[in-house]
Curated annotation (Swiss-Prot):
It comes from Finegoldia magna (strain ATCC 29328 / DSM 20472 / WAL 2508). It holds the Pfam family RRF. The keyword Secreted does not apply. Responsible for the release of ribosomes from messenger RNA at the termination of protein biosynthesis. May increase the efficiency of translation by recycling ribosomes from one round of translation to another. SUPFAM superfamilies: Ribosome recycling factor, RRF. InterPro entries: Ribosome_recyc_fac (IPR002661), Ribosome_recyc_fac_dom (IPR023584), RRF_sf (IPR036191). Signal peptide: none annotated. GO terms for biological process: translational termination. The gene is frr. Its main location: cytoplasm. This is Ribosome-recycling factor. It is found in: Cytoplasm.
Amino acid sequence: MSKQILKDMETKADKTLHALKEELKTVRAGRANPSILDNIMVEYYGTSTPLKQVATISAPEARLLTIQPWDKSIMKEIEKQIQASNLGITPSNDGTIIRLPFPQLTEDRRKELTKVVKEYGEKSKVTIRSIRRDFVDDAKKMEKNAEISEDELHVLLDDIQSLTDKLTKEIDNIVTDKETELMEI
């Protein structure tokens, strides 16, 4: 019974860790990432179409994205939409490929992003603690309803706490890795 409770807790906690990792992917770390263009829509034959559906987007260098439209007639439209998106990137068009050079992050911007990363980590820790509280309450109800003994309750509570500590440490490691990535020049 207690193994199932721990398994359920770990399943819920894994969702929190996955959500944290996904949130951290949105924090730009000076490297060019094609996913930054996911929300850009271009007018193509009278229809608003996602950029990735009308062009090949690649990252040939750490701080450069290239966009190669399949139909060269929409190059101006792509440029216009990138400039309108307020990404802080100026596209350069050579007639066949649009290049997006990503500027180096300033020290102040890096520190700002580090604070954002810490906030994401703290939110995840709060979620983990909330999950722990729910499972501790469930365990106490089980003991009150005589489903488990008092000794089993104490063992289960210790296991829940050690799992919580492990998950908190994992969140700290994820946040530290992202901070390190942000601060490297």
